A protein has these predicted regions:
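C-terminal, charged low-complexity interaction regions
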Residues: 379-426
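Flexible, glycine/charged-enriched surface loops at secondary-structure junctions
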Residues: 114-121, 153-155, 194-200, 278-279, ...
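Iron-sulfur cluster-binding cysteine motifs and their immediate structural context
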Residues: 220, 263-285, 289-315
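Small-residue-enriched alpha-helical segments and adjacent helix-cap loops
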Residues: 2, 10, 23, 27, ...
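A hydrophobic, small-residue-rich beta->alpha segment in the mid-to-C-terminal subdomain
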Residues: 319-362
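A glycine-rich phosphate-binding loop feature that marks nucleotide/adenosyl-phosphate handling sites
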Residues: 161-164, 201-210, 368-381, 401
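Generic secondary-structure signature for well-ordered alpha-helical cores
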Residues: 110, 114, 144-148, 189, ...
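Charge-rich, low-complexity segments
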Residues: 1-73
Length: 426
């Protein structure tokens, strides 16, 4: 039976849509503390202000991250959520679980916590909502010793790396995202669990430009699969698509009256760089102009495939609004080989290069993208030891002045004044 009146929350149960309110009420029948979370959220809706205290450091021994402190500022009114800490558990690569593992994890959370979960957080972790301070250490012991699972990242550290399904299920993946994600997760355990950065830092691994983990928009360091040779074309299948014998988009739009497939309107005219055209019944591509956006491949997957020389692009600096607003990542390295054969050493070298610089010059609570913005891209790529490329140009220059670095000027900027006066006597 409900412990609190929640008329505002009850409105969220109306209609045909899933409702977190209904979910919490169902869980409250098993764990009465959940009635208090509904009561506090109702009060927050009524007062139009959160009733979680700001901050609060709590954790498990030896770890600086993985637990997000939550304390109620009205504990006498809602004692069940006086402590209601969030636990982040590192998800397996690509979020593959056995039902046995999920049942064991849920049983553990019912034992030590509220039983409420969020599968998954936007970074990727398994989010376990609601644990009292005194239950954290017993939960952590059982999680690590019985289930052999670990906490994820929180705070100013490396957040839990995340990846798409990669080559386990997707034929477009240009590198093994699961192996890369798992290897770097294990390689950087200290950085995940012991905050040492100016602010959070996120890796995300997408196998192709479809970017199913939104790495370009949500990660400080995005590794996005690509290729550097030509798109592979099966001209016979192109003819079949044009004739309507193969459904476009892998049949994803079946059931609607979309009319006959129009390769000109649906593929060629939508190419962002206009690098495609038809010659008779053959599709032609100027691969030197192709941006590897994946659109044509998505529409005609049986006719087009990524090139055979595969790797990844590295983009850096994406973030949600913090100081300077949301921003997409900037392309830093157009192509790099990503392989477990060398234990991803070339990727690790780039990561540690930027960390060394960012930890030195980054301000407190400043994402690496904001540091890049503050110092300017020319300074950043110089620090990274890279040459500028056209993709780094945001807009055409708007002033007539050209800055020359000292080393770019023959003889530098230093001049002998006495020698100058001899040659230019008054």
């Amino acid at each position: 039976m409900a412990k609190h009146d929640t008329p505002l929350l009850d409105e969220l149960e109306k209609g045909p849509w899933p409702s977190f309110v209904s979910d919490i009420k169902r869980q409250a029948e098993k764990n009465p503390d959940c009635w208090d979370i509904l009561g506090q959220v109702e009060l927050s809706y009524k007062d139009k202000i959160t009733h979680w205290k700001h901050g609060g450091i709590v954790g498990v021994f030896g770890y600086g991250g993985g637990i997000v402190g939550r304390y109620s500022d009205v504990p006498k009114q809602f004692p069940g959520v006086e402590h209601f800490h969030t636990v982040r558990v590192n998800q397996p690569a690509s979020k593959y679980y056995s039902t046995e593992n999920l049942r064991a994890l849920m049983a553990l959370w019912d034992k030590h916590g509220s039983g409420m979960t969020n599968m998954h957080g936007s970074t990727g972790d398994i989010i376990l909502l609601g644990c009292r301070t005194e239950a954290l250490e017993p939960f952590f012991w059982d999680l690590t010793h019985d289930l052999k699972q670990d906490l994820g990242g929180s705070g100013s550290n490396l957040r839990t790396p995340a990846n798409c399904l990669g080559q386990s299920r997707c034929e477009w993946s240009c590198y093994d995202t699961e192996e890369a994600c798992h290897h770097l997760t294990m390689h950087y355990q200290d950085e995940i669990h012991r905050p040492a950065f100016p602010y959070k830092f996120k890796f995300k691994f997408s196998g192709c430009a479809n970017d199913c983990v939104a790495a370009l928009a949500r990660s400080d360091f995005a590794v996005i699969g690509t290729w550097r040779d030509n798109i592979r074309i099966d001209q016979a299948s192109v003819k079949e698509y044009v004739a309507g014998n193969i459904a476009s988009n892998g049949g994803a739009h079946a059931g609607g009256d979309w009319g006959a497939f129009d390769i000109q309107a649906e593929v060629i005219d939508l190419c962002p760089t206009d690098c495609m055209w038809m010659e008779g019944d053959e599709l032609k591509i100027d691969d030197s102009e192709c941006t590897r956006c994946m659109h044509c491949i998505n529409v005609m997957p049986r006719a087009l495939r990524p090139g055979a020389d595969q790797g990844a692009s590295i983009c850096m600096g994406a973030k949600a609004p913090i100081l300077d607003g949301a921003q997409f990542a900037t392309l830093i390295i157009p192509f790099i080989k990503v392989s477990a054969d060398n234990e991803f050493e070339n990727v690790i070298d780039v990561i540690e290069n930027v960390w060394d610089w960012w930890m030195e010059v980054g301000k407190n609570r400043e994402r690496v993208g904001e540091t890049m913005q503050r110092v300017g891209l020319p300074t950043f790529i110089k620090v990274m030891g890279l040459e500028p490329i056209p993709q780094m140009v945001k807009e055409p220059r708007s002033n007539p002045y050209v800055f020359w670095a000292d080393e770019e000027v023959p003889g530098g900027f230093e001049r002998d004044v006495d020698e100058f006066r001899k040659r230019h006597a008054a």
